[in-house]
UniProtKB/Swiss-Prot annotation:
Protein's recorded name: Membrane protein insertase YidC
Organism encoding this protein: Methylocella silvestris (strain DSM 15510 / CIP 108128 / LMG 27833 / NCIMB 13906 / BL2)
Family to which this protein belongs: Belongs to the OXA1/ALB3/YidC family. Type 1 subfamily.
Taxonomic lineage: Bacteria, Pseudomonadati, Pseudomonadota, Alphaproteobacteria, Hyphomicrobiales
Membrane topology per record: Multi-pass membrane protein
Pfam families: 60KD_IMP, YidC_periplas
Free-text function comment from the UniProt entry: Required for the insertion and/or proper folding and/or complex formation of integral membrane proteins into the membrane. Involved in integration of membrane proteins that insert both dependently and independently of the Sec translocase complex, as well as at least some lipoproteins. Aids folding of multispanning membrane proteins.
Length: 600
């Protein structure tokens, strides 16, 4: 590999570090007016958003009692509840406000310890990190209609909600309107809400349906640039909309609006999400908003308002919406998208720019996992398959390297012949390559090939919940987390965690697998002819060390992939070079290195 190709190799490697490793450091229409009415009646503080004079502030939402901090248990006990129990979730529904505000996940725990607490997703208002969803109706501007509010207590026809037994809630406003709400849940994470309003009064009533998901307090995020956490949604036929919490806070009036037919919107964390989903054929006005309660607690909301409907005396109107609250399982989201027709619901997972590679990579890993029962083994097999697919390119690359080695004496002669004329050296070198049919850049093809695979596998390991707490062998119990061992505490002999040190802790996550990766990369470098340029030689010598420190804090599944890929690359290169009759540099370079150590 000549100077030019080595420069390209170096540039690609350092670009990989910059892009991946350092990412750690990082007058409205009627429906609009109906939304404003809903905003004022559902938890929005006065004075920060336009108000509808026809809809009074819901004082019950911000009483001094509610402003007092509560434990989650105290907040749950503050309202009558209806039990929720499915194969995937457990919790309760608040009959006060008919809110879905208590959901925990049966199949997921906080740590790899099977006795650790279940993941708590939704919590009631007043609890720390309140997070809930609700749906209902709001009156049109100028309409003095008593619709259910957050302090309305509904009656239920049963005491538990299960996949086999939907529940129907009822509220009579005493003014001729009777509200019915049927709530059903499937065996995963989807709630279906069917609202109806009977108008038994003597005059028509105009209402609009809405649904929202809200969370109080700024959520804890992992703060990786390669992963989106915050507001997310697909409205109409547009692409996915993603906004961080602080981005919406900085918007004019603290909100951003969208319009279209169907879609979904809500909040996404790394592995969990809560979204509201309208009828996919209905036009909606959607909004992301950020605000604060009178006590200073930040509140974030994703909501939509449907078309305004006029209900004649004796008539009934209906509205349907859904709430997704659970784990972002790939097969579950795909099934909802296909079976329920939810637009682009798979994009609730942040697949990234390399979607066209990341999704196939996940499918391949999942298929191999179904055969082996171990995602770590699936990663090893997937690497072999990728190597096999690109073997023709790798073969061409290594043969080109062999040819370059063969003409190395001629290149050295050109440097001696034109020691002061760099331009002439370059011209004669390129002419030599042309005569010998050598492509100096082709030697970098193996590196170029593995970069998109690296990104795709990194995304799969980092964002898909299927990789969370997936074990390998030995001490690796979670492929999505860094190697738990650490060189700097002598692999657990010293009672401290070097990764918790400020500023430098992230770069001290040097476990067994990162060390193996560094060694394998060093060996791979030594499999190539050493560069003539002293500076390049130093850079390539230190590159394995840089990668070891940088990738040490990455998911160990990615480090295992990189290590295995290096081993396969060295084996592949050795085989191809021997078949081409070219001497393999690896053993001579390693021997030369140790001779220098002994001599010094």
């Amino acid at each position: 590999m000549n100077k030019d190709s080595r420069n390209l190799y170096l540039a690609i490697g350092l670009s990989c570090l910059v892009i991946v490793g350092w990412s750690y450091i990082f007058a409205p229409k009627q429906a609009d007016r109906a939304r404003l009415a809903q905003t004022q009646s559902q938890n929005a503080p006065a004075g920060t958003q336009p108000q509808s004079a026809a809809t009074p502030q819901d004082a019950a939402n911000f009483s001094p009692l509610d402003a007092l901090p509560k434990t989650r248990a105290e907040a749950l006990a503050a309202s009558p509840r209806l039990k929720i129990d499915t194969p995937a979730i457990f919790g309760s529904l608040s009959l006060k406000g008919a809110r879905l505000d208590d959901v925990s996940l049966k199949g997921y725990r906080e740590t790899v310890d099977p006795n650790s607490p279940n993941i708590v997703l939704l919590s009631p208002q007043g609890a720390p990190d309140a997070y809930y969803a609700e749906a209902g109706f709001v009156p049109a501007p100028g309409e003095a209609v008593a619709v259910p509010r957050s302090d309305t207590v509904w009656t239920a026809d049963r005491d538990a909600l299960t996949p086999e037994a939907p529940v129907t809630l009822t509220y009579d406003n005493g003014q001729g309107l009777v509200f019915h709400r049927q709530i059903a849940v499937d065996d995963r994470f989807m709630f279906t809400i069917k609202d109806s309003v009977e108008n038994k009064s003597a005059k028509p009533v105009t209402l609009a349906s809405y649904a929202l998901v809200a969370r109080h307090g700024l959520p804890k995020t992992v703060n990786y640039a390669v992963l989106h956490e915050g507001f997310v949604g697909v409205i109409g036929d547009a692409g996915v909309q993603e906004f961080h919490y602080d981005k919406i806070e900085k918007e004019d009036h603290g909100y951003k609006t969208f319009s279209g037919a169907g879609g979904w919107l809500g909040f996404t964390d790394k592995y969990w999400a809560a979204t509201v989903i309208p009828d996919q054929a209905a036009p909606i006005e959607a909004r992301f908003s950020a605000n604060s309660t009178p006590s200073g607690i930040k509140t974030y909301r994703a909501d939509f308002v449907g078309p305004v409907q006029t209900i004649a005396p004796g008539a009934t109107t209906e509205a349907m919406s859904r709430v997704f609250a659970g784990a972002k399982e790939v097969h579950t989201l795909d099934a909802y998208q296909a079976d329920l027709g939810i637009k682009k619901f798979e994009l609730l997972i942040d697949w990234g720019w390399f979607y066209f590679i990341t999704r196939p990579m996940f499918r391949l890993l999942h298929f191999l996992y179904s055969l082996t029962g171990n995602f770590g083994v699936a990663i090893l097999l997937a690497t072999v398959i990728v190597k096999g697919l690109f073997f023709p390119l790798a073969n061409k690359s290594y043969l080109s390297m062999a040819k370059m080695k063969a003409v190395a004496p001629e290149i050295a002669a050109l440097r001696e012949k034109y020691p002061e004329d760099k331009m002439k050296q370059q011209q004669e070198t390129m002419a030599l390559y042309k005569r010998e049919k050598i492509n100096p850049v082709s030697g970098c093809l193996p590196m170029l090939i593995q970069i998109p695979v690296f990104f795709a596998l990194y995304k799969v390991l980092f964002v898909t919940i299927e990789m969370r707490h997936a074990p390998f062998f030995g001490w690796i119990h979670d492929l999505s987390a860094p190697d738990p061992t650490n060189l700097f505490n002598l692999f657990g002999l010293l009672p401290f965690d070097p990764t918790q040190l400020p500023l430098i802790g992230h770069f001290l996550a040097i476990g067994v697998w990162p060390l193996l990766m560094g060694v394998s990369m060093f060996v791979q470098m030594k499999a190539n002819p050493e560069p003539a340029d002293p500076m390049q030689k130093q850079i390539f010598t230190w590159m394995p060390v840089i990668f070891t420190f940088t990738l040490g804090g990455f998911p160990v599944g990615l480090v295992i992939y990189w290590t295995w890929n290096n081993i396969l690359s060295v084996s592949q290169q050795t085989l191809i070079m021997k078949r081409a009759g070219v001497k393999v540099e690896l053993f001579d370079n390693l021997a030369s290195l140790f001779r220098k150590k002994v001599t010094s």
